[in-house]
């Protein structure tokens, strides 16, 4: 899932992804935006 959070590293995406998917969320930074996944 692409979320509307700008990023330069996956660490910046981890908290917003965890808010959506819970503690086991996966976070990636692609093309300057966060991508979250449920693990």
From Swiss-Prot:
One of its GO terms (cellular component) is extracellular region. The record marks 28 as: Basic residue of the functional dyad. GO terms for molecular function: ion channel inhibitor activity; potassium channel regulator activity; toxin activity. It is found in: Secreted. InterPro entries: Scorpion_toxin-like_sf (IPR036574), Scorpion_toxinS_K_inh (IPR001947). Belongs to the short scorpion toxin superfamily. Potassium channel inhibitor family. Alpha-KTx 02 subfamily. Disulfide bonds join 7-29, 13-34, 17-36. Pfam families: Toxin_2. This is Potassium channel toxin alpha-KTx 2.17. Expressed by the venom gland. Keywords: Amidation, Disulfide bond, Ion channel impairing toxin, Neurotoxin, Potassium channel impairing toxin, Secreted, Toxin, Voltage-gated potassium channel impairing toxin. Has the structural arrangement of an alpha-helix connected to a beta-sheet by disulfide bonds (CSalpha/beta). It comes from the Eukaryota. Blocks human voltage-gated potassium channels Kv1.1/KCNA1 (IC(50)=4.8 nM) and Kv1.2/KCNA2 (IC(50)=2.9 nM). The modification Isoleucine amide is found at residue 39. Negative results: does not block voltage-gated potassium channel Kv1.3/KCNA3, intermediate conductance calcium-activated potassium channel KCa3.1/KCNN4 or the Shaker IR (with inactivation domain removed).
């Amino acid at each position: 899932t692409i979320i509307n959070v700008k990023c330069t590293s996956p660490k910046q995406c981890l908290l917003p992804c965890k808010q959506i998917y819970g503690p086991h969320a996966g976070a990636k930074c692609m093309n300057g935006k966060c991508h979250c996944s449920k693990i």
